[in-house]
Amino acid sequence: MPSELTPEERSELKNSIAEFHTYQLDPGSCSSLHAQRIHAPPELVWSIVRRFDKPQTYKHFIKSCSVEQNFEMRVGCTRDVIVISGLPANTSTERLDILDDERRVTGFSIIGGEHRLTNYKSVTTVHRFEKENRIWTVVLESYVVDMPEGNSEDDTRMFADTVVKLNLQKLATVAEAMARNSGDGSGSQVT
């Protein structure tokens, strides 16, 4: 359970964590769960997170993303990502595993490319909170990945955790700016 969460948030998110963010680990794999509080409506945050074809909107380290010409955002579709230089990766082919607009859940697997994240799977969920006429969002992102040969669990987790945390921080920055710029706090949505 991420330490960034309040007791109320933890209590409300318990079922979602059990359903979407808990993994059966094989020997040689590790997982982690991160939370990000965002001062923007969940509809706005979801409009950014759900765009499998535009991860660079909020994900650091992505130079470009391409999809097939007649791309339809549906489970099973793929994207090809080119990673910025300086990381232990060049390219990544990723498959959309889940996209549930009603429950605001999305997830993908890395299925190819030049990188060290073998069997990487990620799930992201977007949650609405309201208290004293304030609305905010908590985003949970978890992953499971095989540890590369020669790397410890701590090494693997440190690298993946850093990337996930930076992406969630950028998501908060982007969504909060969009909400502020809309004037009414509702934000516009990514199209």
UniProtKB/Swiss-Prot annotation:
Region START-like: which residues?
A: 23-176
The cellular location(s) given in this protein's UniProt record come to: Cytoplasm; Cytoplasm, Cytosol; Nucleus; Cell membrane
Q: What is its main location?
A: cytoplasm
Q: Where does abscisate bind?
A: 59, 89-94, 116-122, 141
Instruction: Report the GO molecular function annotations.
Output: abscisic acid binding; identical protein binding; protein homodimerization activity; protein phosphatase inhibitor activity; signaling receptor activity; ubiquitin-like protein ligase binding
Q: Where is this motif: Gate loop?
A: 85-89
Q: What is the effect of changing residue 88 to S?
A: Insensitivity to pyrabactin and impaired ABA-mediated binding to PP2Cs
Q: Where is this site: Involved in interactions with PP2Cs?
A: 88, 152
Q: Sites of the modification Phosphothreonine?
A: 78
Gene Ontology biological process terms from the UniProt entry? abscisic acid-activated signaling pathway; positive regulation of response to water deprivation
Q: How is it modified after translation?
A: Ubiquitynated and degraded by the proteasome upon binding to the E3 ubiquitin-protein ligase RSL1 at the plasma membrane.
One cellular component GO annotation, for this chain's record? cytosol
Q: Where is this motif: Latch loop?
A: 115-117
Give the signal peptide range.
none
**Outcome, altering residue 78 to A:** Reduced CARK1-mediated phosphorylation
Q: What is known of its domains?
A: Upon interaction with ABA, the 'latch' and 'gate' loops change in conformation leading to a tight dimerization and the creation a surface that enables the receptor to dock into and inhibit the PP2C active site.
Additional observations? The synthetic growth inhibitor pyrabactin inhibits ABA-binding and subsequent PP2Cs inhibitor properties.
Q: How does it assemble?
A: Homodimer. Binds ABA on one subunit only. Interacts with HAB1, AHG3, ABI1 and ABI2 when complexed to ABA, and possibly with other PP2Cs. Binds to CARs protein in an ABA-independent manner, both at the plasma membrane and in the nucleus. Interacts directly with CAR1 and CAR4. Interacts with CARK1 in the cytosol. Interacts with AIP1 in an abscisic acid-dependent manner. Interacts with FREE1 (via N-terminus). Interacts with the E3 ubiquitin-protein ligase RSL1 at the plasma membrane.
Q: Which family does it belong to?
A: Belongs to the PYR/PYL/RCAR abscisic acid intracellular receptor family.
* The protein, known as: Abscisic acid receptor PYR1
Name of the gene encoding the protein in the UniProt record? PYR1
